């Protein structure tokens, strides 16, 4: 099988892991808009492409798929997931399987208020969230929530334009300067990252890897430690059973008063996925099984606890003309 990894950026490990699974009977092609994306040089072949908002971007990607006889395509950045999901039929018509959830669920994942409402409607614990200043102030006045609060864009990634709100003056200022926002209760407890694989044939959860985040950097997990809790596994399975996600997704969860609360869902490989892979949760094997039209057997909780992941800088040296 030949794999196309879009917008690979600095995700060298993902390219390397894909090669370990698919490299024996296929090859890995990577793309990015910059020749200075180091992951390109871990692939068997690479293309420098326009940014994803270029009017010909999709046609360029489809041409690469045809020219390279690509079997599987996936992206590593949020803004591109919706583009792929919108055009699944175009990929499938040339024999390419996009590893992405259905468009409806990609859109819900990237609209934090929609995700909040979905969780509330399906009795899934989630963080209290509001999309209007009036609603927030009413909750404060009735003492249902208190300062500090947490503000962030309704859609977005990489922890951009987020703010801890300490008082009414900061609240008013943030809401005045941000067009689409949500205000949430502030969570200062343990944040947990969950790498989840959902079988694309059966719709069942195949694997879950959970880690407590020890340090974050630019919205990605920098240091974390693995752990297991059947209560958390059941919480995630309930969410998946109510939703329509498939393949690999990344879920962020908080703990409050002994209960798990869903925070966000990213329908792609999360920045902390290498932790899961190195602990034996090989989602590329699961993808390969599904592409071969076979179901994966569930193996939730098969990894070891107390395994720490610590990211560190690495360099790529290339001669360029």
Where does each model-flagged region fall?
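ATP-dependent carboxylate/phosphate-activation module, predominantly the ATP-grasp catalytic core
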Residues: 184-244, 248, 266-293, 301, ...
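Active-site nucleotide/adenylate-binding loops and adjacent lid/helix of ATP-dependent enzymes
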Residues: 106-188, 200-202, 230-233
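Short, charged, surface-exposed secondary-structure boundary motifs
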Residues: 38-41, 56-59, 107-111, 159-162, ...
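ATP-binding N-terminal substructure of ATP-dependent carboxylate-amine bond-forming enzymes
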Residues: 1-99
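Short catalytic-loop micro-motif centered on adjacent basic/acidic residues
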Residues: 4-5, 72-75, 127-128, 182-185, ...
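Preference for protein termini
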Residues: 1-29, 68-69, 200-202, 206, ...
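A short glycine-rich, hydrophobically flanked beta-strand micro-motif that places a catalytic Asp/Glu
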Residues: 246-257
